[in-house]
Amino acid sequence: GADNIIIKQYFDGAGFQNFNINGTMINDLITTLHGSDSNDWMSAWSDNGVTIKGEGGNDTINGGNGDDILDGGTGNDWLYGGNGNDTYIFGKGYGNDTIEDWGGSSIVKLKDISSSEVTITNLWDSTLEMTVNGTEDKLTINGYKWNQGGYTFEFADGAVGTVNKDTWELE
């Protein structure tokens, strides 16, 4: 079965705390990280794919080299994908999230947003901004032209959008 490790009062320390767990490969075991309703900083610098859920608060989430799933949840979050083929989750009520991704092909799943509900803007010739019409929610992708694999957007209504360098297509 799945084992859990709970470290109580981990964040009460004055700085980073290190724990050694002998007899196991901890990177191979961790597949999902959950944040809290506070402002979290979470990182999974691993070559394995990890799911990281920020929950509430203004979170900073780092995916690493694997094919990760990053879900900031509510709050204004920064999502750093790393080098893998990453998937980002965004929905209504999520706030203002920002994605930075350095390589691979990226998927943005818009879990409850239809293609007709968004406005897409190209800012400063390298930043894509997707605003959910009628809300305060906004998804910003910094340096989207530098991600060599491009981005695929999967909308709740089944529509698929792609952006690669200077081209936006919606099917």
Regions found by a protein language model. Name each.
Residues 1-15, 39-125, 131-149, 154:
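Acidic, glycine-rich calcium-binding repeat modules characteristic of RTX/beta-roll
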Residues 16-28, 153-166:
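Repeat-associated, polar segments at repeat-unit boundaries in modular proteins
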